[in-house]
Amino acid sequence: VTFINRSDGVCVARAQRLVLATGCRERTREMLTVPGFRPAGIFTAGLAQEMVNIYGLMPGKKIVVVGSGDIGLIMARRLTLEGSQVLAVLEIQPQLSGLIRNKVQCLDDFNIPLYLEHELLEILGKNRVEGIRYRDVKGQKEVYMKCDAVLFSVGLIPERDLLIDQEMTPSNEVRLAGNANYVHELVDHATKESEKIGQEIAQELLGAKNV
């Protein structure tokens, strides 16, 4: 395995097992092929979370969340508490993709509307987001909504590019752990799965029954 660290630079290590615990990444606006320009004010929910929590920056004043993933629901509440107005959460599916408890605690408790079976059609604005067009997928009625920021919370993808680039597949020698294996609903589940894999590998390599 070739890797890099700050103290030693490029290093090479021999290993009998490789565990890929690279987590997952957010789906982006580009993956949805949403028409429109690329103005300022378009973020993934995770990026908005980093902006607010770490840098103290707000993505906008009037915000629309596209998708009902848990990070998006949590950020809808957080941005409301920070003083922004979350105008709506749009979800193209007939059901919520996040946890029900997050809908109750993050949307219902703060009177943030959730529009199921509604599709984002276009993001408007050249320099800065000025609004969006969306529609009801059943009635096909198009609506314009003025806003200055759009957050995407449309799912997570296991991060496996390292395996793909090396033309490798998971095996007994190459394991996937946590969200790199599949996206878990709770981080505790990913942690427990990773601990189990670590114990299994230790038993295989050390031949021990209790590790």
What kind of region is each of these model predictions?
Residues 1-211:
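Residues forming the flavin
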